[in-house]
């Protein structure tokens, strides 16, 4: 890795932002940890930031030469808030931007796909990370994790579709390389784990590793959409349910070598993630 200036991490307490901040600071890089509450992050300088409050943007960008961008959560049109900020960042001297997107959203596609499309014209050095679904969705604060704890059930409209679930630590490791390597990737990177699993497989692995029975219940698209509307805005719920339907049709049944290629090590398996969490909690 090359010596860098200061990296602004937007969403520094989130699933990938917190891990990216931790890996950067552990390697000796300077980090500004941005969030609405400016929550302290070990080894980083906390700074208040709200996508929807432009008054917070200039101070967050002060002294920064690269940014890690996590879009505003649940916003079906993040470009409206993100693109003005990115133009400001470019004017403020930021020369490298790494955007967190999704394997389900192509360049120019819905939601953050519009930001993806704009990024190469704004920054000479850039990358778009397009991870598959996070393994941490089943262990953290995600709706799947909550329903596993509360009901022993994973609810989806994904049927028997398979997904290359990826560990957030591996996403962060790729983000660190994309932010700090001498040459930026200047491309989008689809990030997956080493294998594809159905939600039935996920339930079976959780049951085997934890000893607690977990099952996958399959819902029709409409019921899944309606279930999600109790948790997120209606338009975003429809988009998430559409993603489940795409999984059912095979859209996420793939693996890539991007994690291994960028980090020099293979991605972690879901079983290894659960085994590690069980050891930490015992």
Question: Predicted regions span which residues?
Answer:
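Oxidoreductase cofactor-interface core, primarily capturing Rossmann-like NAD(P)-dependent enzymes
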Residues: 2-33, 42, 52-54, 62-64, ...
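A hydrophobic C-terminal alpha-helical subdomain
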Residues: 221-282
């Amino acid at each position: 890795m090359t010596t860098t200036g200061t990296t602004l991490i937007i969403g520094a307490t989130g699933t990938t932002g917190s891990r990216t901040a931790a890996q950067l600071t552990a390697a000796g890089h300077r980090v500004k940890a941005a969030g609405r509450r400016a929550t302290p992050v070990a080894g980083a300088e906390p700074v208040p930031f709200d996508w929807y409050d432009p008054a917070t943007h200039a101070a967050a960008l002060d002294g920064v030469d690269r940014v890690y961008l996590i879009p505003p959560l649940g916003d079906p049109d993040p470009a409206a808030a993100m693109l003005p900020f990115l133009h400001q960042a470019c004017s403020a001297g930021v020369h490298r931007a790494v955007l967190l997107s999704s394997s389900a959203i192509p360049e120019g596609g819905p939601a953050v796909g519009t930001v993806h499309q704009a990024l190469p014209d704004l920054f000479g050095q850039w990358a778009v990370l397009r991870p598959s679904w996070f393994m941490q969705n089943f262990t953290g604060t995600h709706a799947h994790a909550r329903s596993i704890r509360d009901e022993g059930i994973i609810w989806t409209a994904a049927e028997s579709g398979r997904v290359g679930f990826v560990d957030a630590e591996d996403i962060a490791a790729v983000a660190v390389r994309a932010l700090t390597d001498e040459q930026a990737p200047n491309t989008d990177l689809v990030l997956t784990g080493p294998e594809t699993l159905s939600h039935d497989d996920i339930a079976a692995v959780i049951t085997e590793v934890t000893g607690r029975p977990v099952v996958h219940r399959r819902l029709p698209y409409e019921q899944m959409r309606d279930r999600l509307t109790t948790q997120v805005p209606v338009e975003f719920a429809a988009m998430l349910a559409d993603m489940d339907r795409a999984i059912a049709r095979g859209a996420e049944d793939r693996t890539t070598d991007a994690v291994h290629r960028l980090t020099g090590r293979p991605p972690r398996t879901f079983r290894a993630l659960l085994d590690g969490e069980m050891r930490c909690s015992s």
